[in-house]
Amino acid sequence: MRRVHLELAILRYVHSIISCYSGPHGRVNVMLVRGLFNNFKIPIWYKYDHVLGKKEYLDIVEKMESLGFNVVSTSCDMARSNQKLAKSLGVTEETPYFPNPSRPASNIFWFYDICHLMKLVRNHLIDQGFILRGL
């Protein structure tokens, strides 16, 4: 059985930047499966302007498990919808994991994408500026 890392990525696009697409959508949610020990990353699911719910997420995990993948973790940005999904799965600071629906004796660990968060902070500082008092 292959070990994989299930990566949940929420991408937000501005309409004017997407020159190849002129539809009514403001964002797209994409889920990728990525190898933990193998070098691959494959998109497995996407929907426009959609919030991924607990049942739908667990169905995707079960489908990946049925295909022979051993799902061991999920990573995502800290969008409110992702925090809500994590909470619905029972993820907390003390227990950053939840039981794998296909293998209840195993856990799936939940990670937030720190590099993405640092990029958001950088962009906020560039866009909004900052004040250094006393200098």
Segment roles from a protein language model:
Residues 1-22, 73, 89:
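Folded interaction cores of globular domains that provide primary macromolecule-binding surfaces
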Residues 6, 15, 37, 83, ...:
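Sequence-pattern detector for short linear motifs
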Residues 1, 51-135:
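Histidine/cysteine- and/or acidic
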Residues 13-70:
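Electropositive, glycine- and tryptophan-enriched low-complexity nucleic-acid-binding patches
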Residues 6, 11, 24, 43, ...:
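Proline-rich intrinsically disordered, low-complexity coils
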